[in-house]
Amino acid sequence: MTEQATTTDELAFTRPYGEQEKQILTAEAVEFLTELVTHFTPQRNKLLAARIQQQQDIDNGTLPDFISETASIRDADWKIRGIPADLEDRRVEITGPVERKMVINALNANVKVFMADFEDSLAPDWNKVIDGQINLRDAVNGTISYTNEAGKIYQLKPNPAVLICRVRGLHLPEKHVTWRGEAIPGSLFDFALYFFHNYQALLAKGSGPYFYLPKTQSWQEAAWWSEVFSYAEDRFNLPRGTIKATLLIETLPAVFQMDEILHALRDHIVGLNCGRWDYIFSYIKTLKNYPDRVLPDRQAVTMDKPFLNAYSRLLIKTCHKRGAFAMGGMAAFIPSKDEEHNNQVLNKVKADKSLEANNGHDGTWIAHPGLADTAMAVFNDILGSRKNQLEVMREQDAPITADQLLAPCDGERTEEGMRANIRVAVQYIEAWISGNGCVPIYGLMEDAATAEISRTSIWQWIHHQKTLSNGKPVTKALFRQMLGEEMKVIASELGEERFSQGRFDDAARLMEQITTSDELIDFLTLPGYRLLA
C-alpha cells in the first residue's frame, strides 16, 4: 500500500490503493477511464462554460424558449432506435444510493426497476463511491449479500428488478482523481467503472448497461453523452445502441429542448423522466433575476400547478411521439408506523400517481419499498394488460407554449414555510457533509434537490425584498435570526447527544453562506463536496 499519489498515464490518484480500490481500479479499467477522460473532458468543460453563458443571457432578460434553428428536428417524423425487452415495463421504479443493504432491498422490492444512485442521494465520499461500484458489480453477478450487526442476512431473491445506474452530473468533479492537475468529471468516473466491470455480465443475462443521466441543460450535452456511449461501444466491439439511457428533464432550459435531446441521443435513449424537485429548483435558479417569477412556499408548489402540469404533459407528448418512455416523478413519502397517518401518506401517493398515470406516464418513481404496492396498484389499474402507455399521444392537447412553461404559480410565502425550509436544508446539509445523501426528514426521504429548493427560495425572497404573509420583509437579518432560532429547534428535536456529535455548526455556516451571498451559488453540493472526505 503506497502513500504517494499513484499515476497511470495522465491520471493521478490521490488515495492509496486498499483492497477495495484494487477490485475496481484495475489496470484495464483505469486504461479505459483514462481514454474517456482525455477524449471527453475538454468538450465537457466547454459545455459547462456554455451553461454559464446561457445563464448570463437569461439574467440579462432573454427568457428560455424553444430553439428556432432546430424547428426541423421538432417538425420531422423520426423515432428513437428502440427499447430493450427488459425495459419495456417500467411502471414502478425505486431509487436509492449504492449502499449494500439498500441495493439488496431495492432490487427485492415489488418494482420493475432499481435506479442505483451515485448522484443526488449519495454523498460522494471516496470510500462510498468505490464501495458503490463493488456493490453494483456483486448485484449484477447475483452474489451480493449483507449481514447486519444483529446477524440478519440480506440477499437477492429470484428475479430481482432491472438495474439502472445514475451517474453524477456533468458539473460534479471526482476530486480524488486528477488529469492535468484538475479533478476529473465524476460522470465519466461513474460511467467508465460501472460499464467496464458489468457490461459483459449484464448482456449475458439478457439485460444491458443502462444509465440515468441527471441535470442535463441542453441538447449539446445529450450529444456529448451519445459520443461517450458510442466510443465505449466501439472500444469493446458492441453493436451501436447497446448502451441505453434515460435522461432526467429536471432543468428549466432542457424542457425547451426535449425533441432535440431525444434526437441527439436517439441511438441510446429510451426515455425521459420528470425530475420534478430539481426542476422546481432549476426554475428558481434560472429565473432568479425575475421578481415576477418568485415561487411561494415549497409545500404549495405541486404538480397540478399550471407550469408543472404543462411540463408533465409536454414531456409525455414529446416522448411518445418519438417512441420513448415518459417517466413520472418521485414520491418521497416514507411509510408511517402509525396506521392512521400511514393511510394519509398512502392516499397522497395514490392521488399523485393516479394523476401521472391518467396523464399518460409509463411509470413512476418511489423512494421507499413500502410505497411499491400502492404505486404498482395505481399503474396496474390504468395499464391493464399493457406494458406501458407509449400509444397515449395526447393529440387533443393544445400546443404548450413557452409562456405556460414559465408561468409563476400563486401561493403564500409564510413564516412557517420559511422556518421549515431552514430546518430541512440544515439537516440535509449536515447529513450530506457527514457522508449520507439520502435522509429521512419529517416523513420525507430527502435528497439534494429538497435542500436546493429550500435555500434558493429564501435567497430569492431576500434578493427581491419579498414579504411574508404576516407582513415581515424577508431580509438577511431575518434569515439569520430564524437560522439561529431553528438550530435550537433542531437540537431539541434530535436531542443534545445527536446534535453535539453531528456537524450542525458546519451545516449552518454553509447554509448561511449560500443563502446570503450576493451571487446565487449554482449547486450546494459543490461547496459541500469540499467538506467531504
Curated annotation (Swiss-Prot):
Disulfide bonds: none
UniProt-listed GO biological process terms: glyoxylate cycle; tricarboxylic acid cycle
Lineage: Bacteria, Pseudomonadati, Pseudomonadota, Gammaproteobacteria, Enterobacterales
Active site: R166 (proton acceptor), D447 (proton donor)
Enzyme class (EC, first level): transferase
Cellular localization per UniProt: Cytoplasm
Enzyme Commission designation: 2.3.3.9
Protein name: Malate synthase A
Organism: Escherichia coli (strain K12)
